[in-house]
């Protein structure tokens, strides 16, 4: 297993361990996912891929509007939760966004809510999305860019030299990935979203509940010690 496969396996485990608590903690996911809805195609006889479907919350909503919906996630625990709690007539697939288990030109549009920031290398994922999209197909997504969790990142920088927050792409870097004639960025919007927490402990607990506490470059893979949290 190479280092990238190991990282993806760890990400799958992180999100899998959060499957039971994900829906009650996913304030940002709900907000951003609903903000994507006005961008969706009006035509309803379409085949849709929910890439990184998680617990299937938005997969279920998509199924109410489109002919065929596929929910794909790297975490089998997330998928099992989705199968049990959400639409039974959705096609659920375990798969890696870097190697989608789908035929060429088989999908009308791909929906993805706060997923691709975990994908590395992202250009491979974009090529896969373009491969499975039909001619004229659309990729509608939300992601996080540089500046996300900057308060948490700057606070940890005063405690130790470890990486506690993932380095997100800049808006420019993201746009440059969509620069080919076959896969061009048609329209985008960058929006600041502010969530307030009682203290940093509550923020850390929510990130863990979401499975979003995996940082590939982190030296100390365990939880920060008591002294570190007191300094925070």
Go through the PLM ranges and name each one.
Residues 138-202, 209-226:
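Conserved catalytic/acceptor-binding region of the Class I
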Residues 98-109:
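A short acidic, Gly/Pro-enriched loop at the edge of an enzyme's catalytic core
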Residues 123-135:
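A short glycine-rich, Lys/Arg-flanked "PGG" loop and its adjoining helix->strand segment in the class I
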Residues 109-121:
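A short SAM/SAH-binding and catalytic strip from SAM-dependent methyltransferases
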Residues 1-18:
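N-terminal, positively charged/glycine-rich alpha-helical extensions of SAM-dependent methyltransferases
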Residues 27-46:
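Conserved alpha-helix/loop element of class I SAM-dependent methyltransferases that forms part
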Residues 49-99:
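Class I SAM-dependent methyltransferase SAM/SAH-binding core
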